[in-house]
Amino acid sequence: MPRIIGIDIPAKKKLKISLTYIYGIGPALSEEIIAKLQLNPEARAVELTEEEIGRLNSLLQSEYVVEGDLRRRVQSDIKRLISIHAYRGQRHRLSLPVRGQRTKTNSRTRKGKRKTVAGKKK
């Protein structure tokens, strides 16, 4: 398994797919990186030379925000929204959907397991 910026990527998968195992790199960004470094997108990750891995590491560290840095940035953005009392920050704080989805029904993923409340007496 080749190690790129501290992450083991799958060796037997094609390079385009292997790069998506790095947090912050999706299919489109993966293709862009491969084109920028002029690598073969059909090649398997195990076929990369040490020199190509080095170029890939240096490009990812210099030009892209990925893995731990990206996770920290997302968390700090959420903390900032909460601290300035923005609507989105309040939704994050209350563990409710942030982007305007309905909450009368659904939104179970965000709210968590159902909490039973006593029914109305007749």
Curated annotation (Swiss-Prot):
One of its GO terms (biological process) is translation. GO terms for molecular function: rRNA binding; structural constituent of ribosome; tRNA binding. GO terms for cellular component: cytosol; small ribosomal subunit. Residues 101-122 have a biased composition (Basic residues). Transmembrane segments: none annotated. Keywords: Ribonucleoprotein, Ribosomal protein, RNA-binding, rRNA-binding, tRNA-binding. Residues 93-122 are annotated as: Disordered. Belongs to the universal ribosomal protein uS13 family. Located at the top of the head of the 30S subunit, it contacts several helices of the 16S rRNA. In the 70S ribosome it contacts the 23S rRNA (bridge B1a) and protein L5 of the 50S subunit (bridge B1b), connecting the 2 subunits; these bridges are implicated in subunit movement. Contacts the tRNAs in the A and P-sites. Part of the 30S ribosomal subunit. Forms a loose heterodimer with protein S19. Forms two bridges to the 50S subunit in the 70S ribosome. This is Small ribosomal subunit protein uS13. It comes from Chlamydia caviae (strain ATCC VR-813 / DSM 19441 / 03DC25 / GPIC) (Chlamydophila caviae).
